[in-house]
């Protein structure tokens, strides 16, 4: 079974994935980490698109790249057109060779088409205030995540870790019931 976990920056996607890993033995596929690997593989193309300043000591400086791509939708689109197909292919390869419960953690699950690989999708949501408390840099990125709309099962994460664990437990009961 493949479950996608999505939501905006700072909502608690990683925490939900950690709960699924620890309580249910899920294999978590962190799409951000895959993205970091893919960036290194396409660094020459990144220099072509965004200039040499995106490299530092021969490696992609993700902070500089983020500064460039999050200043315009056009730059973000260029980056996504380059890396998303490669990332999706890598996720599909992992799913093909992994058994048991697989969890895909991705803010841009739908935009990347990864939701099509999932049996279920959990969207983690939190208030803007909660998000900004958790992550000071979130404000800049939130405007580029406006298209992340809740899909599948929605889990609100504005409270405690214990509360979130209970909600994830309830979700998993539903998911297992639907499976039978």
Swiss-Prot record:
Ranges for domain DPCK: 2-180
Annotated metabolic or biological route of this protein: Cofactor biosynthesis; coenzyme A biosynthesis; CoA from (R)-pantothenate: step 5/5
Cited InterPro entries: Depp_CoAkinase, P-loop_NTPase
Keywords: ATP-binding, Coenzyme A biosynthesis, Cytoplasm, Kinase, Nucleotide-binding, Transferase
Residues annotated as binding ATP: 10-15
Cell location: Cytoplasm
GO CC terms: cytoplasm
Gene3D superfamilies associated with the record: P-loop containing nucleotide triphosphate hydrolases (3.40.50.300)
Function: Catalyzes the phosphorylation of the 3'-hydroxyl group of dephosphocoenzyme A to form coenzyme A.
Protein name per the record: Dephospho-CoA kinase
């Amino acid at each position: 079974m493949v479950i996608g976990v999505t939501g905006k920056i700072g909502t608690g996607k990683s925490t939900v994935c950690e709960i699924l890993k620890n309580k249910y033995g899920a294999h978590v596929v962190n799409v951000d980490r895959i993205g970091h690997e893919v960036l290194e593989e396409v660094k020459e193309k990144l220099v072509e698109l965004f200039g040499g300043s995106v490299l530092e000591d021969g490696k992609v400086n993700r902070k500089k790249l983020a500064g460039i791509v999050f200043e315009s939708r056009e730059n973000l689109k260029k980056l996504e057109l380059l890396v998303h197909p490669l990332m999706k292919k890598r996720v599909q390869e992992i799913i093909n060779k992994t058994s048991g419960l697989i969890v895909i953690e991705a803010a841009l699950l739908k935009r990347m088409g990864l939701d099509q690989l999932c049996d279920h999708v959990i969207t983690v949501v939190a208030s803007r205030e909660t998000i900004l408390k958790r992550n000071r840099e979130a404000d800049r990125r939130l405007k580029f995540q406006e298209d992340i709309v809740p899909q599948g099962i929605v889990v609100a994460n504005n409270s405690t870790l214990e509360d979130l664990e209970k909600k994830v437990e309830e979700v998993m009961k539903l998911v297992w019931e639907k499976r039978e």
